[in-house]
Amino acid sequence: MPRLIEAPAVIEAAGTKPKRIEEYAGRVKSGHETVSVARMKSPEGWVEPGQTPAFEEITLVLAGMLRVEHAGGALEVHAGQAVIATPGEWVRYNTPEPGGAEYVAVCLPAFSPDTVHRDA
């Protein structure tokens, strides 16, 4: 039988300003270990620590612009665009523009603080 997720789990985010993470499926909300799906709302000027995650992360930007820094430079991902970060690849996310950004992140396997491998 299909299972309705009536409301997400709100998770504390890393970064320089408060960012809202709403997990709809994943380790915290639904017990899924193979996938996580979360909506993020980050303010203008938010910067996350760099990371080298052990999971694939597919990010769909719904509003605003998400900058994704990587070893070879940076990508500006705008509303209606998506970016895929592969496991073992260093990335750093930030939202420098007015209004910040809203986006959905899908992680395979599910996001875990133990496998995100943030910069020290």
Language-model-derived ranges and their functions:
Residues 31, 87-113:
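Ligand-binding loop in jelly-roll beta-barrel domains
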Residues 26-27, 47-53, 70, 94-96, ...:
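Short histidine-centered beta-strand/loop micro-motifs
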Residues 39-42, 52-68, 106:
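Short, conserved beta-strand element in jelly-roll/cupin
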Residues 72-88:
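Short acidic-glycine-tyrosine-enriched beta hairpin
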Residues 65-67, 74, 90, 100:
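Structural motif
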Residues 1-34, 41, 49, 115-120:
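A short, N-terminal "cap"/entry segment at the start of jelly-roll beta-barrel domains
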Residues 26, 38-40, 58, 81, ...:
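Hydrophobic/aromatic beta-strand elements that line small-molecule binding cavities or substrate pockets
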